Each structure stands twice: as C-alpha cells, then as structure tokens.
Amino acid sequence: MNYCKTFLLLLMVATGLPMRAQIHKMERRDSTILTYNLNPVVVTGSGHHQRLKNTATPVRVLSAQEMREQGITTFDGALTRMMPQVSMAPNSMGSQLRLNGLGNKYILILINGLKLSGDISNNVDLNRINMARVKRIEVLDGAASSLYGSDAIAGVINIITDQPTRSLCSAGSTTTISGHGVLTEAATLDISKNGFGSYTSFTHDRADSYRNNDLEYKKDSDTETQPSIAPLFTGYRSNIFAQKFTYSPTQHLALNAGLDYSYKITDRPGTRADVTGGTDYEMRYKGLRWNVGTIYKFDARNSLQIDYSIDRFRYGKEYDVASGGFPVGTYIQSKKQRTIERQLKAILGIIPQGTTIVGNDWQLDKLVATSGNINQETYILAYYAQHEQRLDVGSATLLATLGARYDYHKTFGNHFTPKVSLMYSLGHLNLRATYSAGFRAPGLDELYYHYFSVNRGKPQISFGNLSLKPEKSNYFALNAEYRHDALAVSVTGYMNRISDMVVKQNIDVDNPTRQLLMNEFPEMTQEQADKMVSYARYQNSDKGDVKGFQFNLSANILRGFNLSANFAYTYARTKTGEEWTVLERSIRHAATIAANYHHSWGRYTININLNGRLQSKTYYTGSYEDAPGYGIWNLNTTHSFDVAKWGCLEPSLGIDNVFDRIDRRIDSSTRKYALYSPGRMLAVGLKMKFSYL
C-alpha cells in the first residue's frame, strides 16, 4: 500500500502540472442541531481561512443548511432569496445577474477560488454551477481586485464545494418536483479511505417555458393586441456530471484533480403561422472544466498552494425545424471560449499575529466568435501581496490589512490596484473601514468585435476598439457589527465609483463613412448602406456611482427558532457626457426575511421555513418602462427520518409564491419585468442518503 501511495505521488509530480486540494474536516450536519452557526469559517474576504468575526472585510455566507431549509435548488434562487442586493432577469441568453446595481461583467464568480468562465452576452452561464456539491456560498461586496484581479468591481461570489470524509462510502439522491415542469434530480457517490477520496455527482434540471399573459400589444400600438407564445421564462434541460479525486499521503500534503461537464439546451415554443413568438431553433450550451492542484502545509501558519485549470465553453443554435436552408438538427456555433488559469499562492506566518500572502497569477483567454468575426487571445500576468497584522490595544484588538496587485495585460499594459482595511474589535463589537480598488480588463469581444448583419432589412454594424482602457473603480465602506453565538447584527455603508466604463456608442453615418463601411464589409449592398444612419463602437465613456447601505440580522431567538432579516438600499447612477441617469436594472429598496423552526422527536425532525423577498421597482432607461416592485413569500417544510445508522430519508413539501403574486400585464416592446413567477406552485421533494462506515 505504501508503495502504491509513493508511486501515485511521483506520477502526479512527474506530470509537471500543479494540482489543487483543500485540507479540511467536514462538519457533519446532525438532524438535531437547533441553532445556526453565526461565526463560520470563511476564505474569500482575506484569502485565507479564518472565522467570519475575525475578517477585516465583511463577507456574507449562504450555507447549504439554510438553502436546504428554504427549499432552494438553484444558484440564482439562493442569491435572490437570501440576498436583497442581488437581482436576476432570466432570458434565453442566460440569467442577467446584478449585485448592488452592477451587472454580471463586474462580478467575479469563483468555484473554490478558481474563475468560472464562459459567458453569454457578458452573463456567466449560472447553470454550470453544480448545486449538489455546494457547501456554502461566500459573497464579498465591493471591489476586490487587489486579491482577485480583473472583473472584481461589484464583488466576488465564491462557491465552496464539499468533499465529505466521515464515511468510507456514501450515496445520496435529491429530487424536487414543482409546477411548469420544474424537476431537479441530483445523485452523489462518495468514497473516502486512507487519505484517498473520490466524489462523483450527476445533476439534471429542467423547466418548461411559460408566459403569464397570452396577449401582446401590436408594434407601435398601445390599444391593439395579438396573441403571442414568446416565453416570459425560457424553458431548458440541463445536465452536469462532476468527478473529483483527492489524495493526502501525509497530514502536510494534499492533491486534487477534478472535472465538470455541463450541457444545456433551451426548450422554447416552435414557430407557428397563426401566432407570433415562436422560434425555429434552440440555444445549446456545453462546458468542460477541469483543474488539478496541490497544497503543502509546512505548519499551521505556513502553506504553499498551486492551481491549474482549463475551462472550455461554447454555445450556438440547434435547429428544431428546417429553416433558412438548415435541416433539422443542424448546429451553428456562435461562440467558443477557452480560459487557462494558473495560480501560485503562499500563506506565511512570518510575523507574530500577522499573516502575509504573496502570489502570482497567469490567465490566458481565447475567443472564437462567428457572429463577431473574432479569433483572438490575450493574457494577464499578475503579482500580488497582502499583509494582515493584529495588534492588541488594551482589551481591544486592531486588525490592519494592506494589499496591492500588479497586472500586465497583453493589450492595455500595466495596472496597479491597492487595498487598505482596518478593524477595531472590542468584545463582540467590530468596527471596520475599507478602501479597495477594482478593475476590469476589456473583453476580447470589446477589443476585436467586427460585426455585420441585416435584421428585418436594416443593417447593423459594430466594432471593437483596441485602444480601450481598463474600467476602474474606487470602493469605500464603513461597517459596524455585533456578533455573538445567539445574535449577529451588522450595518454597512458604502460608495463605489467606476470610471472608463466600456459601452457601445452609436456614431452617425455620413456619405464618406458609409463608403468606408462598404469597403470594410463588401457583402453589404448599396441599398443596405443607404439605410444606415449609425454604427456602434465600443468606447470608454460612462462613469458609474453606486451608494448605499445594508442591514443584516441573524438570531437564534429560542431553542429551535431562528430568524434572519436583510435590507439593502442602493442608489445607482451612470453618467454619459454631462448627464447623470439612473443605472439600468438597479433597485432602490429590497429586503429578504426568513423564519425557521425545527424540532426533533427521537429519530424524526421537522423543519418549517417561511421566507420572503420584497423589493421596490426596477429602473430602466430610454423608452422602456420601469418594472413594478413586488413581494413574494415561500413556505417549505422538511421531515427528516434517521431510519438507521446507515441511512436517512428527508421528504419535503412546500408552496412557492404563497399569495399567488403574478405580473399579468400585456406584453409590449417597451415593457420590462422584475417578477417572473408563474404564480403559486406546490413543491415536493425527497432526499435519501446512505452511508457505510
């Protein structure tokens, strides 16, 4: 056996590939636990593991236990039900995620610290996230580029996965069924023995398309209507297969290798002659992500970690019917992306009561986009350092953090981002102040886009811009927090100022310009060119200003009764030229509330959870209407039966949208929505878990 371990270790080292692993002990969830852990271990805020109370930068933690109790099965459901500063707008091109008013391209999404790539119109495909393995979700508000680099302007969302080690072999299955064809099925198989671990999972999700009003206004009319089958919510079918291996030959060394494959295809109404809104094709998405890594712990305070990952993603059209000369089953690729990432990080306890982090990141991005005529790649090379020092000041403690990052981008060159934070702690009270800078490197589509198409007889032209500068932000925050075993209360005020925002600007077309455009796109006819009044080009133009405050409360009020309440006020604006306007899709007021009760009688435990989300209107610009606010409440009950030492059954029964709130307005070309619920729905689930010690 020792020979096999040595051979496996030498084989992994000989490949020359860095590998990733996490050394940790799983906390078993006992069905008799009656309180929430209000001081969990987190990693995202500081880059190393520490208790939430001890972090100089506030982090919001969404635990798997809370998600299970609320009956949450999707990633977007977890964020919107539990975090008021987050909103989603689903469509056929992916969910439009927003954090504190800022869109998906300003939010860095990580899985165990590694970037999740693959976007659809700047929206990361959230269906690639394997909820069957989520242990917790850590959300860091505000700029965090000093540690995490590009894209971390609005914040960082880090999904931490679970690799249980308590049982030799365990298997589980979770099924949830609800209205409008909603089905979630997840199966897991885990093996852990003598430092070796194997973790296998498969997840299938599906939902049907629907709309809440069968009518729409005819174009340019606010009185005449016609039937439509264009979905408000786009149905889909998706599968995720994941395999992860871990190996710890000693208590100091851990190795890890993992692979995730994802597949998704939309399920929309087909084209019909008697009604508008159907389509001839579905959108198909595929992703393949694998990573290897290693971590070596010299002692409790000093470690070295190396990670390497490759993430491939592609999407395009798959025709349901013969159309436009394409037979049934034809696949036309729209976009193919590949991201290669390598991280090297050392966590050092050189100075007493201090933690130093130094690291080097390298990332290569490649994009092939048929619609934009792009086949390009770029890279970023970065070095960063951060020192965190704790000082005792009488009975109080002062924690100071200073960090900086240097990035070199192939196109725009050098960039520097600093961070400074202070935390004053006295007993259970924490006072925090943070300044951090953020930046976002222009995407390959924004740099190299070269697009021409004709839509309903009108030509459309868009260009990228190699002279683009990175978008930059300055984030300031003040936080006061009281955290105890039974109560956690915090108030945060912040300001995030963004400059050099990359936007598409329309440029007027005159006769000389029209001729230049015809030379650039020879396929454009003179008749089409004569119809052009403008073309689009990516430019650094707008400024953004986001201010707000957040209130968070979590309490273990009585034995078995827990309450959480969160409120976010967001005042978000953008400036084009000399005019300030409201930031599109921002929400001024939002709140989430959850009350949870659980009790055990012998081998049976009941859990009752009531949760709600309330928000004011969603702002839109131009000719679009603002989307009205809403309030939705959900009720979920779970019933746990510990049938034996080797098995547990947990049926669940819930009602989504208890009060049947629906936006039934007649659709139009200027109408926007915030509430996408089809109304009250019954949700039924069953979780089974079996283990062999």
What are these regions (language model features)?
Residues 166-167, 191-283:
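Periplasmic-side early beta-strands and strand-to-turn transitions of outer-membrane beta-barrels
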Residues 7, 247-248, 433-436, 562-564, ...:
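Conserved C-terminal beta-signal and adjacent last beta-strands/turns
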Residues 391-395, 495-497, 522-618, 689-692:
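Gram-negative outer-membrane beta-barrel transporters
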Residues 373-374, 410-415, 424, 428-476, ...:
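Surface-exposed extracellular loop regions of Gram-negative outer-membrane beta-barrel proteins
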Residues 335, 339-346, 382-384, 469, ...:
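Outer membrane beta-barrel strand-and-loop segments of large Gram-negative receptors
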Residues 118-120, 133-135, 146-158, 163-214, ...:
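Outer-membrane beta-barrel translocator/receptor signature
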Residues 76-114, 135:
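Extracytoplasmic beta-strand/coil segments of soluble accessory domains associated
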Residues 114-141:
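Short acidic/polar hinge/loop motifs at secondary-structure boundaries
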